Design a protein with these regions (language model features):
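Acidic carboxylate diad motif detector
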Residues: 1-123
Length: 123
Protein backbone atom coordinates (compact mmCIF):
# COMPACT_ATOMS: atom_id res chain seq x y z
CA UNK A 1 0.00 0.00 0.00
CA UNK A 2 1.27 3.45 -0.90
CA UNK A 3 1.04 6.49 1.34
CA UNK A 4 1.06 8.98 -1.55
CA UNK A 5 -1.80 9.93 -3.86
CA UNK A 6 0.36 10.26 -6.96
CA UNK A 7 3.68 8.97 -8.26
CA UNK A 8 4.33 11.80 -10.70
CA UNK A 9 4.69 9.77 -13.88
CA UNK A 10 2.68 7.95 -16.53
CA UNK A 11 3.53 5.31 -19.11
CA UNK A 12 2.95 6.01 -22.82
CA UNK A 13 2.65 2.88 -24.99
CA UNK A 14 2.91 3.64 -28.71
CA UNK A 15 1.79 0.58 -30.68
CA UNK A 16 2.59 2.12 -34.06
CA UNK A 17 6.23 2.80 -33.18
CA UNK A 18 6.55 -0.22 -30.87
CA UNK A 19 7.84 2.08 -28.10
CA UNK A 20 7.17 2.58 -24.41
CA UNK A 21 8.06 5.90 -22.80
CA UNK A 22 7.85 7.24 -19.27
CA UNK A 23 6.51 10.79 -18.89
CA UNK A 24 6.76 13.02 -15.83
CA UNK A 25 3.54 14.85 -14.92
CA UNK A 26 3.76 18.02 -12.85
CA UNK A 27 2.23 18.27 -9.40
CA UNK A 28 0.26 21.27 -10.69
CA UNK A 29 -1.56 19.03 -13.20
CA UNK A 30 -2.44 16.55 -10.43
CA UNK A 31 -3.68 19.29 -8.13
CA UNK A 32 -5.89 20.82 -10.82
CA UNK A 33 -7.31 17.54 -12.19
CA UNK A 34 -7.21 15.16 -9.19
CA UNK A 35 -6.19 11.93 -10.92
CA UNK A 36 -8.35 9.21 -12.44
CA UNK A 37 -11.23 10.64 -14.43
CA UNK A 38 -10.04 14.27 -14.28
CA UNK A 39 -6.44 13.49 -15.19
CA UNK A 40 -7.69 11.27 -18.02
CA UNK A 41 -9.81 14.10 -19.41
CA UNK A 42 -6.85 16.49 -19.38
CA UNK A 43 -4.36 14.05 -20.91
CA UNK A 44 -6.70 12.88 -23.68
CA UNK A 45 -7.80 16.43 -24.51
CA UNK A 46 -4.14 17.34 -24.96
CA UNK A 47 -3.30 14.24 -27.04
CA UNK A 48 -6.21 13.32 -29.32
CA UNK A 49 -6.27 15.49 -32.47
CA UNK A 50 -9.51 17.27 -33.35
CA UNK A 51 -11.56 15.17 -35.76
CA UNK A 52 -9.74 11.93 -34.91
CA UNK A 53 -11.60 8.74 -35.81
CA UNK A 54 -12.59 7.05 -32.52
CA UNK A 55 -11.75 3.66 -34.07
CA UNK A 56 -8.57 4.89 -35.73
CA UNK A 57 -4.94 4.99 -34.63
CA UNK A 58 -5.16 8.65 -33.54
CA UNK A 59 -7.44 7.77 -30.64
CA UNK A 60 -5.86 7.17 -27.24
CA UNK A 61 -7.11 4.80 -24.56
CA UNK A 62 -6.12 5.60 -21.00
CA UNK A 63 -6.13 3.40 -17.91
CA UNK A 64 -6.37 5.84 -15.02
CA UNK A 65 -6.34 4.78 -11.34
CA UNK A 66 -8.16 7.16 -9.04
CA UNK A 67 -6.27 9.66 -6.92
CA UNK A 68 -6.74 7.63 -3.73
CA UNK A 69 -6.28 4.22 -5.36
CA UNK A 70 -3.68 2.18 -3.48
CA UNK A 71 -3.49 4.56 -0.51
CA UNK A 72 -4.35 3.62 3.09
CA UNK A 73 -7.83 5.00 2.38
CA UNK A 74 -8.44 1.78 0.42
CA UNK A 75 -9.23 3.28 -2.95
CA UNK A 76 -9.69 0.51 -5.54
CA UNK A 77 -11.21 2.28 -8.54
CA UNK A 78 -9.82 3.12 -11.97
CA UNK A 79 -11.24 4.68 -15.11
CA UNK A 80 -10.77 3.66 -18.72
CA UNK A 81 -11.05 6.75 -20.94
CA UNK A 82 -11.03 7.40 -24.70
CA UNK A 83 -12.86 9.14 -27.52
CA UNK A 84 -16.11 7.21 -27.80
CA UNK A 85 -17.07 5.49 -31.07
CA UNK A 86 -20.70 5.71 -29.94
CA UNK A 87 -20.99 9.50 -30.00
CA UNK A 88 -17.58 10.84 -31.08
CA UNK A 89 -17.19 12.55 -27.70
CA UNK A 90 -15.85 11.56 -24.31
CA UNK A 91 -16.12 7.90 -23.34
CA UNK A 92 -15.29 6.36 -20.00
CA UNK A 93 -15.89 3.38 -17.77
CA UNK A 94 -15.29 3.19 -14.04
CA UNK A 95 -14.08 -0.15 -12.73
CA UNK A 96 -13.12 -1.80 -9.46
CA UNK A 97 -10.89 -4.70 -8.52
CA UNK A 98 -7.15 -5.13 -8.19
CA UNK A 99 -6.01 -3.57 -11.49
CA UNK A 100 -6.05 0.05 -10.27
CA UNK A 101 -3.95 -0.50 -7.14
CA UNK A 102 -1.57 -2.84 -8.97
CA UNK A 103 -1.01 -0.19 -11.63
CA UNK A 104 -0.29 2.42 -8.95
CA UNK A 105 2.13 0.04 -7.18
CA UNK A 106 4.20 -0.20 -10.40
CA UNK A 107 5.02 3.48 -9.87
CA UNK A 108 2.77 4.88 -12.61
CA UNK A 109 -0.39 6.96 -12.30
CA UNK A 110 -1.71 6.00 -15.73
CA UNK A 111 -1.04 4.03 -18.88
CA UNK A 112 -1.92 5.67 -22.20
CA UNK A 113 -2.05 3.46 -25.30
CA UNK A 114 -1.59 5.08 -28.73
CA UNK A 115 -1.58 3.97 -32.33
CA UNK A 116 -2.09 0.66 -34.05
CA UNK A 117 0.20 -2.35 -34.16
CA UNK A 118 0.83 -4.20 -37.42
CA UNK A 119 0.20 -7.49 -35.60
CA UNK A 120 -1.34 -8.52 -32.27
CA UNK A 121 0.92 -7.71 -29.29
CA UNK A 122 0.88 -8.02 -25.51
CA UNK A 123 1.30 -4.91 -23.39
Amino acid sequence: MSDVAFNGKILNVNLTKNEVEEEIISEEVYRSHLGGYGLGARLLFDRIPAGADPLGPDNVIGFMPGLLTGTPLFGQRFSVVCKSPKNGGWGDANCGGDFGPMLKFTGYDAVLVYGKSEKPVYI
